[in-house]
Amino acid sequence: SAAEAPMDKDIAFENVSFHYGEDGPDVLENVSFTVPAGKSFGILGGTGSGKSSLLLLLCRLYAPTEGKITVGGVDIADMPARYVRENVGVVLQEPFLFSRSVQENIGICGASDAEIRAAAVTACVDGDITRFSQGYDTMVGERGVSLSGGQKQRVAIARMLTKKTPVIVFDDSLSAVDTETDEKIRSALDRDLGGATTIIISHRITTLLDCDNILVLEKGRVSQLGSPKELLAQPGIFRKIYDMQMSIGEEEGA
């Protein structure tokens, strides 16, 4: 039945428009693209581009005003919202951590010790954790160690990895780590994700260059869509932002 159709299939946004409230302005306007199953798909967009709304729609937190979102040809509106959310792992830019041990934060969904450790290694946070006074039993938050933004993001990535969902979304969730760590995490994820469909939302182009395809979203519309190579070869916002970020990167590296 459509109710709990498998979600390890192509995800398609078909002519999706969306606005909040009855007569709010369109946040997304006639957006169409396909995320092939098991591939990595980048979404580049600044503030107000509509990228966060795409995520809210994919997680069934809102419904499109027009158009539909399908997984393997099945409209997600016909699936239980709970089921959709259980199958889409999301790592937010500012993740929520519980005032519990690091171990409990990562294994909140019932992962074994070995799975927790493996996830932390993939998320490049195992080294940090083992340096804490109590290692994985170190408390997080007010009564324990206060984690940096980058450490929080990596703990949240490890937590999401233990869920083993068929779809994974990173919502600017590598923004607080430096470019080198970002690269390390991404290559570890490529190695360990084993067939998950991965959507990476970012404003940092280097984070997206390894994706199979990239969507450039501008003011709620599809501005460009293609492989990184194709987008770098054509004049447009992607190339412009790439050149800008690369020149800033060179100054930082000097």
Question: Where are the predicted features?
Answer:
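ABC-type nucleotide-binding domain
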Residues: 4-254
